[in-house]
A protein has these predicted regions:
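Conserved beta-ketoacyl condensing-enzyme motif
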Residues: 15, 19-96, 104-107, 241-257
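A short glycine/serine-rich beta->alpha loop
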Residues: 38-44, 75, 102-105, 151-153, ...
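Secondary-structure boundary elements
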Residues: 61-67, 123-131, 169-182, 238
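Short coil/turn connectors at secondary-structure junctions
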Residues: 67-71, 98-101, 126-132, 153-154, ...
Length: 328
């Protein structure tokens, strides 16, 4: 931060040291001081496409599926806009069939990929022959903000750029979606808005990028209100909290992870994948949960029910129950 006083410099160092982020990736910002939203959006489209292409190619290769077999394309992003968007560019560059069905989940925030997964599951339930490619790409660094607004300082310390993708098909003999073929099944999902929290988190379009509203009250509200809702939903599925040993929690930041630990009565080891992704990549908004699920799929010794959680403006809480079963 330019022209920081010694006191301000110490504040920045303290916030960054406590962010839980050791490494992250960011695209170069436009070559101007405090660029306009229009300048930032001009940088979004080509960079988003580059990251999305890499993520989609990796997902297709991992699933053993040709791009031409994809019947549905779902894209997720809250950090940029454009029409035609990067989804059409994916069709041309992967390439996908020209008649692929496209759905975009836009501007929902960090929990956007949960909604994308829900849509993917609906597609494969409606048509068992469907083959869905889901891609979430976020360029959070485009919206770095100058100045000493506390919300902006925290956001600058946490957020990063990244893209993740998965392939979803109908699971053999089950009415559920399967991520990257057979090893991670989406069994059920749900969503709620925590009462009285509408003003605590926001993502606002302003003249110089998108601006984050992030109240310090968010973790305490999650800690107080999460458990009763989760217990009720899990009971409807015949499960209790102690029966869920594996968790995939969107790491909005260390305090949000700590709030989930407190509310759900978890041990730190149960969210180690979330902590590791935050440390290695930062908070990549909607793409982050796909990084965590990828590690869940490929980590030995993690089988059985898994509960994924995401948080966003509202305060919205998204939950997904997944079944981890390693391929034979």
């Amino acid at each position: 931060m330019r022209n920081a006083s010694p006191r301000q410099q110490r504040l920045l160092e303290r916030i960054y040291q406590r962010s839980g982020v050791m490494h992250r990736h960011c695209i170069p910002l436009p070559d101007s001081s405090n660029p306009s939203t229009a300048e930032r959006m001009r940088s979004y489209q080509p960079a988003a496409l580059e990251l999305a292409l890499e993520a989609c190619r990796l997902a297709l290769k991992d699933a053993g599926i040709e791009a031409s077999a994809i019947t549905h394309l779902i894209t997720v992003s809250c950090t940029g806009f454009g029409a035609p968007g990067f989804d059409l560019a994916l069709i041309a560059n992967l390439p996908l069939a020209m008649d692929v069905a496209r759905t975009h989940v836009g501007f929902m925030g960090c929990h956007g990929a949960f909604n994308g997964l829900r849509v993917a599951r609906a597609f494969v339930e409606a048509d068992p022959s469907a083959c869905v490619l889901l891609c979430a790409v976020e360029l959070c660094s485009l919206h770095l903000q100058e100045g000493w607004n506390p919300d902006h300082i925290v956001a600058n310390a946490l957020f990063a750029d990244g893209a993740g993708a998965v392939v979803a098909v109908a699971a053999d003999g089950a009415d559920v979606g399967s991520i990257n073929k057979t090893d991670l099944q989406l069994v059920a999902s749900t969503s709620t808005v925590l009462p009285g929290t509408e003003e605590l988190m926001g993502w606002i379009i302003e003249d110089h990028g998108f601006s984050m509203v992030l109240s310090s009250k968010v973790p305490s509200r999650i800690a107080a209100q999460l458990r009763p809702w989760l217990e009720q939903w899990l009971a409807s599925l015949g499960l209790t909290l102690p029966e869920v040993e594996t968790w995939a929690v969107h790491p909005g930041g260390p305090r949000i992870l700590a709030a989930v630990l407190e509310s759900a009565g978890l041990q730190p080891a149960q969210i180690d994948l979330s902590t590791a992704v935050l440390r290695q990549f930062g908070n990549m908004s909607s793409a982050t949960i796909l990084f965590i699920l990828e590690r869940l799929r490929t980590t030995a010794g993690r089988e059985g029910p898994c509960l994924a959680l995401g948080f966003g403006p509202g305060l919205t809480v998204e939950a997904a129950l997944l079944k981890v079963q390693k391929p034979i």
